């Protein structure tokens, strides 16, 4: 395979820290991953599951020539990769196409989050985009038929099914010789070690993760995209504010703006949590045995 194509993939799971890991890895001098910068508009190419997501997702690469162009500046880098979370859920199509286009020696990285927490996080994410108008309880009760009957709805509404990791992970382990599993909680609480373990896995030098860099775990959502844009683009007017306002005032202003125009994410009801723990119980046990990791804390 060409050195200007990926030799590793982050395949999921959705809402499990993949974007943060992507951002940490791509800062390494010997890593290339497509991003929104440098005229590359696709952060998640999703090329290997294009048939599964057609009509459901707007932003994806649908042909190999365009896929190759994403990595045209990667030549000379030791680690070339991309992160597309739907590769885990639609594993059958993904694995078939990964082998077809990238070969069998590709390295696979999988982040896994407590499926109960992941389900609610996905719900909050979809709600943010205004693609969800049901309550969490309503959505998970009709999930299967909803996805089957609506060919335009995002795969992200598979709040429960996307957390049934066992068969997905098993398929990747059986299909590729180099598969690295990272638990979301390990990534959150020991980010530096988790990222450097990935560097070791990719056979490149370690790098210290700056303390101010944090994994984005969410928590609040913007009440309006206009306010989100203003907040995210604050660097453009921060220079002016530094000239007219002292630091303590700027800090309070920043906190006020964030708290005023964001909303708390939905929280899970006790009975809903109990239902989901029971739903995932057997799959978690099977997964625990498969990856040889204690996952009992996911059942509490």
Where are these regions (language model features)?
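Active-site rim elements
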Residues: 51-56, 84-85, 154-163, 183-185, ...
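The conserved 3'-phosphoadenosine-5'-phosphosulfate
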Residues: 43, 170-274, 292-300
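PAPS/PAP-binding and catalytic site of the sulfotransferase fold
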Residues: 19-30, 94-103, 122-125, 166-206, ...
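PAPS-dependent sulfotransferase catalytic core
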Residues: 1-87, 101-106, 116-142, 147-149
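Hydrophobic/aromatic beta-strand patches that form the interior of the parallel beta-sheet core
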Residues: 81, 107-109, 180-182
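Canonical radical SAM enzyme core domain
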Residues: 113-116, 188-189
């Amino acid at each position: 395979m060409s050195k200007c194509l990926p030799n590793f993939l982050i395949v999921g799971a959705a809402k499990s820290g993949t974007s943060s890991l992507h951002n940490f890895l791509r800062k390494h001098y010997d890593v290339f991953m497509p991003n929104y910068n440098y005229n590359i508009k696709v952060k998640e190419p999703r090329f290997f599951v294009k048939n599964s997501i057609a009509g459901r997702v707007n932003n994806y690469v649908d042909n190999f020539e365009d896929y190759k162009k994403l990595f045209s500046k990667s030549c000379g880098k030791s680690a070339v990769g991309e992160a597309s979370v739907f590769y885990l859920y639609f594993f059958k199509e993904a694995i078939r196409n990964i082998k077809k286009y990238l070969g069998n020696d590709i390295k696979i990285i999988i982040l896994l989050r407590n499926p109960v927490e992941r389900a609610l996080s996905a719900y909050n994410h979809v709600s943010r985009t205004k693609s969800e108008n049901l309550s969490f309880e309503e959505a998970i009760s009709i999930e299967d038929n909803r996805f089957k009957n609506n060919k335009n709805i995002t795969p992200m509404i598979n709040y429960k099914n996307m957390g049934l990791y066992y068969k997905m992970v098993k398929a990747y382990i059986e299909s590729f010789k180099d598969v690295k599993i990272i638990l979301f909680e390990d990534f959150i609480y020991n980010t530096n070690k988790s990222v450097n373990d990935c560097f070791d896995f990719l056979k490149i030098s370690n790098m210290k993760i700056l303390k101010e860099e944090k994994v984005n775990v969410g928590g609040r959502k913007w009440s309006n995209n206009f306010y989100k844009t203003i907040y995210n683009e604050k660097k453009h007017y921060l220079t002016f504010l530094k000239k007219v306002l002292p630091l303590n005032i700027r800090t309070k202003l920043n906190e006020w703006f964030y708290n005023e125009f964001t909303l708390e994410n939905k929280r899970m009801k006790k009975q809903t949590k109990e239902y989901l723990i029971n739903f995932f119980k057997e799959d978690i046990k099977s997964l625990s045995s498969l990856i040889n990791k204690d996952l009992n804390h996911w059942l509490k």
